[in-house]
Amino acid sequence: MTFDRRRASELQRKLSELVKEEDCFDPEAVEAVGGLDVSYKGDVGVSALSLIDYKTLRPLKHYYVVARVPIPYVPGFLAFREAPLHLTLIKKVKGYDLLLVDGHGRTHPRGLGIASHVGVTSGVPTVGVAKRRLVGEEERCGERECLVHEGKVVAYVIRRGKQKLYVSVGHCVSLETAYQIVKRLTVRRLPEPIAWADRISRSLARSLQLP
């Protein structure tokens, strides 16, 4: 399948204008947080959505969808490969206050990583949690580490050992709220919702019997 980067870039710029960098929910009333991640076997992708109790950090439920992915991985355009899988799940699953997405939100060359793409197109509050930096420079912001791009703080950095997590706005959440929620949910290498989604998707992908 041919991938048109120019048209994809234009769509990203248009959608980036629709991102809301403010809380569309009450941060004090959060009860359940979902995590989204994708694993692959060949050209088949498995998207998993894991719901975690925000107070106890215990897993509540896990959901998944399996489908062939016709679009190849293109740096900066991950959403066009993985977002359709995520959106299929989001339409089916209820009972969460926001979603953590494995990938970037606003920390993207055109301001629309997969977390923002998924958030804007679904209307669901999302947070980007990425393991690698796409844009910006790391600086000190008081007692925190932050990522600054074009003169603006676009992410906070959370460290767990040698692992860095870049926490950014996806959609319908403020950066401060995104940081506080991810920090609370991260007791090991990854925030619990994404860690569970990663485990589930990897396990299912390994078990697939492909022709």
UniProtKB/Swiss-Prot annotation:
GO terms for cellular component: cytoplasm. One of its GO terms (molecular function) is single-stranded RNA binding. It catalyses: Endonucleolytic cleavage at apurinic or apyrimidinic sites to products with a 5'-phosphate. Mg(2+) binds at D37, D102. Signal peptide: none annotated. The keyword Metal-binding applies. Keywords: Cytoplasm, DNA damage, DNA repair, Endonuclease, Hydrolase, Magnesium, Metal-binding, Nuclease. It is found in: Cytoplasm. It comes from the Archaea. The record marks Y73 as: Interaction with target DNA. Its cofactor is Mg(2+). Its EC number is 3.1.21.7. Its main location: cytoplasm. Belongs to the endonuclease V family. This is Endonuclease V. It comes from Ignicoccus hospitalis (strain KIN4/I / DSM 18386 / JCM 14125). The gene is nfi.
